[in-house]
């Protein structure tokens, strides 16, 4: 028999794998999958981190998400309706350059550690 379909309500999300500057909330975890929501306050910048062997897909619901990552000078920016792919082991940080909270839906594929906080990588990574 198959598993039942489940709905996780917004008020049922659980705090998950903290990184300074952002609030991750877990909706559910299944073998090879992590799904949740990420909120970054206006003007906030996260700490540097990566997602181990997990591939991450982000969907921007509201606000702006700016991502800096190891080995690249400058940043990429995503807006509502945009998708972002963060490859496994990619050291990065998010920021929100606007005056409104950004909201992102995350789906991660893999069974690694969800978030590994790390020290700032060597240059280049800033504009």
Cite the ranges covered by each PLM segment.
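Conserved short histidine dyad/triad with adjacent acidic residue
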Residues: 36-52, 88
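A short beta-strand-loop-beta hairpin characteristic of the jelly-roll/cupin
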Residues: 57-80
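Histidine-centered metal-chelating micro-motifs
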Residues: 45-47, 66, 74, 84, ...
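Ligand-binding loop in jelly-roll beta-barrel domains
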Residues: 79-80, 88-114
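A short, N-terminal "cap"/entry segment at the start of jelly-roll beta-barrel domains
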Residues: 1-36, 47, 116-127
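Conserved hydrophobic/aromatic beta-strand scaffold that supports enzyme active sites
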Residues: 35-39, 57, 75, 83-85, ...
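A generic "binding-loop/recognition-motif" signal
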Residues: 44, 53-54, 72, 90-91, ...
